[in-house]
């Protein structure tokens, strides 16, 4: 039987069907394309561990560099600001110290002039056989600075005993002028009391001290510090200063009068200077 006579069955397919081989071919092509797209979407090109470590190290080093730059810039800005503020504040603080020092210096200098006008000898320090006249204005100027700082420190540490009111910035110098007027009044009182009897002078100084405290202070901290200054100053005066043979207009001046004057004068002066320091600092 020849090949032509062999009957090959041909199955029937629906219209539009191109054959089983074409279908398989199209299905295989579609499946391959879908697989490629799926694989390309699911998997990205992988990096080695060394490459990943290098990338992480470079990123961290860049972040460290950026943070250091920011920190350096902030430090420079803070340093500039702090230097400027410190410089200006130091100048202001020094000027305030000079004002307080000047109050103590001027008051003591004028008090010495009053003593000289009354033809009284200047106070000398007696240490055994060594006698000398110290620069009282400069000494009391430094004492005034210590008092001014002590008043402000006391108010900060014990606010319940501080002064009731604190004046505004614009009225501070008005209060300083009032303190100067109080110093002048105290000096005039000293000058007049040199020619008054002992009992009257003590009463006048006590009244003057109480008035100065009531007008300029009225605080518990102020009266405590002024009292401490008065007591310590009086003790040093009694033990160190030589007041023997004091003569006023040829008549021997009683030493007891000076001894009773000193506490009241120190109390009044410390009240004025302390409140000036409380005002400025």
UniProtKB/Swiss-Prot annotation:
The modification Phosphoserine is found at residue 28. InterPro entries: INSIG_fam. Residues 121-134, 187-189, 257-260 are lumenal. It is found in: Endoplasmic reticulum membrane. Keywords: Endoplasmic reticulum, Membrane, Phosphoprotein, Transmembrane, Transmembrane helix. GO terms for molecular function: protein folding chaperone. It is a multi-pass membrane protein. Residues 1-93, 160-170, 216-221 are cytoplasmic. GO terms for cellular component: endoplasmic reticulum; endoplasmic reticulum membrane. The chain crosses the membrane at residues 94-120, 135-159, 171-186, 190-215, 222-256, 261-281. It comes from the Eukaryota. Its main location: endoplasmic reticulum. One of its GO terms (biological process) is ergosterol biosynthetic process. PANTHER family: INSULIN-INDUCED GENE 1, PROTEIN NSG1-RELATED. Belongs to the INSIG family. This is INSIG family protein. It comes from Schizosaccharomyces pombe (strain 972 / ATCC 24843) (Fission yeast).
């Amino acid at each position: 039987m020849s090949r032509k006579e062999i009957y090959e069955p041909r199955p029937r397919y629906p219209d539009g069907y191109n054959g089983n081989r074409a279908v398989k071919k199209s299905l295989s092509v579609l499946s391959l394309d879908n697989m490629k797209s799926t694989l390309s979407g699911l998997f990205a090109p992988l990096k080695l561990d060394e490459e990943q470590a290098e990338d992480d190290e470079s990123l961290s080093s860049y972040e460290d560099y950026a943070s250091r730059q920011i920190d350096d810039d902030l430090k420079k800005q803070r340093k500039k600001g702090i230097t400027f503020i410190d410089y200006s504040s130091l100048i202001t603080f020094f000027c305030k110290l000079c004002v307080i020092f000047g109050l103590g210096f001027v008051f003591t200098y004028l008090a010495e002039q009053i003593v000289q006008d009354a033809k009284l000898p200047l106070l000398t320090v007696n240490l055994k056989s060594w006698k000398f006249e110290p620069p009282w204005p400069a000494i009391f100027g430094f004492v005034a600075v210590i008092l001014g700082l002590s008043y402000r420190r006391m108010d900060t540490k014990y606010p319940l005993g501080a002064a009731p009111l604190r004046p505004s910035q614009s009225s501070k110098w008005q209060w300083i002028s009032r303190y100067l007027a109080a110093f002048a009044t105290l000096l005039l009182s000293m000058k007049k009391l040199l020619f008054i009897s002992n009992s009257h002078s003590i009463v006048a100084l006590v009244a003057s001290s109480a008035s100065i405290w009531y007008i300029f202070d009225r605080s518990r901290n102020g009266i405590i510090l002024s009292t401490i200054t008065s007591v310590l100053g009086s003790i040093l005066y009694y033990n160190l200063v030589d007041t023997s043979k004091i003569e006023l207009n040829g008549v021997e001046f009683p030493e007891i009068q000076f001894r009773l004057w000193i506490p009241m004068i120190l109390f009044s002066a410390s009240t004025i200077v302390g409140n000036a320091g409380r005002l400025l600092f």
